[in-house]
Amino acid sequence: MSMPAAETQPKKKRMTFKMPDAYVLLFMIAFICAIASYIVPAGEFDRVTKGDVTTAVPGSYHSIEQSPVRLISFFTSLQDGMVGSAPIIFLILFTGGTIAILEKTGAINGLIYNVISKFRTKQLLFICIVGALFSILGTTGIVVNSVIGFIPIGLIVARSLKWDAVAGAAVIYIGCYAGFNSTILSPSPLGLSQSIAELPLFSGIGLRVVIYICFLLSSIIYIYLYTRKLKKSKDASVLGTDWFPAAGMGEAGKEEDQSVPFTVRHKLILAVAGLSLVGFLYGALKLGWSDSQMAATFIFISVLAGLIGGLAANDIAKTFITGCQSLVYGALIVGMARSISVILENGKLLDTVVNALASLLDGFSPIAGAIGMYIASALLHFLISSGSGEAVVFIPILAPLADLMGITRQVAVEAVMLGEGVVNCVNPTSGVLMAVLAASGIPYVKWLRFMVPLALIWFLIGLVFIVIGVMINWGPF
């Protein structure tokens, strides 16, 4: 006699939390700020203007009549944020267009593949040269998100050098982000942050170069020590026994497919780009050039590089526009984030927030205040993984707060740059990190085992330089 089949209970779908898109998150924050304008008392500081810089007068905060942000004003604030951020938005778009043309000519790929092929058999030299190359591309903003495309090359080299996938990905990805996280010349987020804080573009470069070198050296040493462990014992890998989890990745048979020529034409294109950026840097530091001149520099590089690269006029135009399109998401998020400041300003809440933070930090030394900014920026970056988005949300609050606490705005900007930088390579909301791990087959938890110690080293380096910045009154203001 057969027994009746046991009834199977339908499986309940498990509710899983999904991190909202950055635009959704910023819209929610903007909406909350608009609601707050009906509840939170409005107020403002008296301000004084010295030259081109406007600062809040400490102790001058006073209540004013409530200025609620109504429904129509809320939506027009989104437009106002875009319009107010237009110079930076176009600068970011033009950056994408220029990089697309440099890539189209083959100059960037030719340089990278040429360096990798030359030094791939020399372990320490390979880590130093390739790590330094990608860090330069990262700190100038030339290769940031596109680093994902070079991960397979790192895996190929890792297999030939008897490393694991983590080491192969790290040389490329961490090399790039060691530079980006301690950026010297990136239009976004550094140029954007300094513009919001009313600082001269790329000012304070001397100390930033030292910070960049420390980030790079610590990364190179850390990766090299890890590869030495792999040479001594196969059990040293954070991946266990499966050194290349992504099927087919890093196979030696693909090496020949990666041969890319590096011609005189490529070298000339890179020379033009490099000299143009050096020329702009001189103009920014000595002649007061700003984002308008930088955008013009990118257009100049695009046209000249395209012509030297043998591209037709139509190809230059189409490639430039395609490159701009690739950065629309990151560019418009600047305007979206700026709308939050517009709402806080229209609702007369920005100074209320600054005053509340100043009261909370009352009695704290400038050093303690700067460290607080540094840690707060790191924590905020887990929510707003866009560096430019975080800068536009945070800098309008921190700049006047820095004035009130006796901290230079340069230190406040660097606290945000380093705060977001030290968590970039462990941040689960980072699309670039997740793409790198997917391309290399590295589980996120195992990546954390490798990356967290280096992130802590970066954090301590950042902490030391934030303190130094306060002590030397790092400016110009």
Swiss-Prot record:
It comes from the Bacteria. Disulfide bonds: none annotated. The keyword Transmembrane applies. Keywords: Cell membrane, Membrane, Transmembrane, Transmembrane helix. GO terms for cellular component: plasma membrane. It is a multi-pass membrane protein. InterPro entries: C4_dicarb_anaerob_car-like (IPR018385), DASS-Related_Transporters (IPR051679). The chain crosses the membrane at residues 22-42, 82-102, 124-144, 205-225, 268-288, 294-314, 316-336, 364-384, 387-407, 425-445, 452-472. It is found in: Cell membrane. Signal peptide: none annotated. To E.coli YfcC and H.influenzae HI_0594. This is Uncharacterized protein YcgA. It comes from Bacillus subtilis (strain 168). The gene is ycgA.
